[in-house]
């Protein structure tokens, strides 16, 4: 009996900690409960897995030498992400690198706890790293003053550069600065293979022109380069090799429709779409043009 308790103790302790985190750090947003609905984890392709809640992506990229985790969703999402990783047969303790798309509480809120339990390195753009260290919301973020900020991440946050590649075992992931939604937005690319078949996967950061009341994309004093940044990010989506698209909010890339089609046996694999990134750029650019037109009417 004593041996059984000793064996179970680490698992029980992790469950207790995760439950406490989920209960003590609720996020104050209307959509949070809906976003944080449980989602059964699944293989996207090769060594790439979806481990997030239903409405907020978190992606695990595995290797024999350790794993990479993209995004941590909400603070209260950490227990679900950890449980999903375990359900797939992996361990949070084997995550070696955690990276982020953009530093809003619905995509970075769970990173501090995931890092604490894994001991992983946290890698982020210079702007994102600064916000992670100080907590809150960056003052030049278009949504500053209208959204809940993140708690400061007390452990070291390493700064990355545009085009920098990070490798664990046979797995490599490359950072691409795609600002606009925030000044530090970052997209990620890598290859995953099943046998001799390999696909270019893109985790494309959000590019929606959402802002706090009073922010103007056409003449922002706090983020004057925002329109140029959006255009650079659209060009990235239009030109980068992209066969499987994932987005921080899975619905933006029709992930659930594609998964359901795959489960019905649709062929070729609905997850694979060589035009998805370009289509996302078209939609995002149209959203910005609409926002600009609305601002010019005022």
Residue ranges and their predicted role:
Residues 48, 76-79, 86-165, 265, ...:
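Active-site HxH/HxHxD metal-binding segment of metal-dependent hydrolases
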Residues 47, 61, 71, 102, ...:
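Divalent metal-coordination and catalytic microenvironments
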Residues 24-30, 37-38, 43-45, 67, 74-76, 94, 156, 165-168, ...:
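Metallo-beta-lactamase
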Residues 1-6:
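Positively charged n-region of N-terminal signal peptides that target proteins for export
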Residues 271-298:
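C-terminal regulatory/interaction regions
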Residues 7-19:
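Bacterial N-terminal signal peptides
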């Amino acid at each position: 009996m004593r041996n059984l308790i000793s064996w179970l103790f680490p698992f029980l302790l992790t469950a207790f900690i995760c439950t406490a985190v989920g209960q003590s750090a609720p996020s104050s947003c209307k959509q949070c409960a809906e976003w944080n609905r449980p989602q059964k984890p699944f293989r996207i392709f090769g060594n790439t897995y979806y481990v997030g809640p239903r409405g907020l992506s978190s992606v695990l990229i595995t290797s024999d030498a350790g794993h990479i985790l993209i995004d941590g969703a909400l603070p209260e999402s950490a227990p679900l992400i950890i449980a999903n990783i375990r359900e797939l047969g992996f361990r949070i303790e084997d995550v070696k690198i955690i990276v982020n798309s953009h530093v809003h509480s619905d995509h970075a809120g769970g990173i501090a706890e995931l890092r604490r339990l894994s001991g992983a390195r946290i890698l982020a753009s210079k702007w994102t790293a600064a916000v992670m260290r100080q907590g809150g919301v960056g003052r030049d973020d278009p949504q500053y003053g209208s959204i809940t900020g993140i708690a400061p991440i007390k452990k070291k946050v390493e700064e990355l550069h545009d085009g920098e590649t990070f490798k664990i075992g046979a797995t490599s992931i490359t950072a691409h600065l795609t600002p606009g939604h925030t000044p530090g937005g970052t997209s990620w690319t890598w290859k995953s293979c099943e046998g001799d078949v390999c696909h270019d996967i893109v985790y494309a950061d959000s590019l929606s022109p959402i802002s706090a009341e009073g922010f103007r994309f056409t003449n922002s004093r706090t983020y004057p380069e925002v329109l140029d940044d959006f255009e650079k990010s659209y060009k990235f989506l239009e030109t980068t090799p992209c066969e499987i698209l994932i987005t921080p909010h899975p619905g933006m890339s029709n992930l659930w429709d594609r998964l359901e089609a795959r489960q019905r046996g649709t062929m070729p694999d609905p997850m694979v779409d060589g035009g998805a990134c370009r289509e996302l750029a078209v939609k995002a650019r149209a959203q910005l043009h609409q926002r600009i037109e609305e601002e010019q009417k005022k």
